[in-house]
Amino acid sequence: GIFAAEGEDPESGLFRLRETDTAIPRNLFLDYDCAALLIALLGMLPHADRDEVWDEIPFRHPARVVLRYDLRGQATASDNARDIKRLVELAGPHRCTPISPRTSEPEYELLELDYLAGDIEIDFADPEVIRRMADNSREPDQWFSALYKLQLLGVDEWSGAVKRALRRDSFQGHVEKPLKGKLPLSVQELWMSDGERTVALDDLSDGEMQLLLTLGAVRLFGDDETLFLYDEPETHLNPSWRTRFHLDFEKANEAKGNAQAIISSHSPFL
């Protein structure tokens, strides 16, 4: 709230209100375009957490992800370069494949990146990567927030007409997201593992993808101050998963607190 709790002051009988900062709300809109990014970062969670929350999904462990970044022409490149640099360090040496010329000396002094565009491969099964993730001060939800913001810079690809239309408070209509190839950050490949075999994320069923995304968001962002708004989160789930969705929500929610959810659904199972 705006006001802090009143402390006990035996020497003062006055009632005082002490102001305190109100936390800034964090609004995240998660759709299937950012599903791969969120699911990839589940690889930063402990192995046991994924076993507990998604025990009925065989290929629930992210094994390897290839993230493509492209800071060419980005006005905020200097701010985002720090996140890319940390990502390259996390992946380890020789895990970044350049897709642009080497940066000039002035560019390197500003950004500290050898290349403005490249593919970063993170192997979640590599013991050294696991060690670096454990030593890293950033939590998975903080990684997602940083990379999600970088992904949002793709709106710069909107046409001038679309940008002008969005400035009007009365605007009503549909705006297409920029193509994946024009985003400053995108997931090129994501492979999932059952502990022995690996498959591409696209080979998972729609229901498995939906359960990984919806419960993954709860596991990463759920706390006492979080409210999830779900619009038919069960569309691709089988009847058993639909019936138990509220129990799975609570299970994913145990790690951080007591997040709440408002769900719209036509399903009698849910």
Could you say what each language-model-derived stretch is?
Residues 1, 182-270:
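Secondary-structure-rich domain cores
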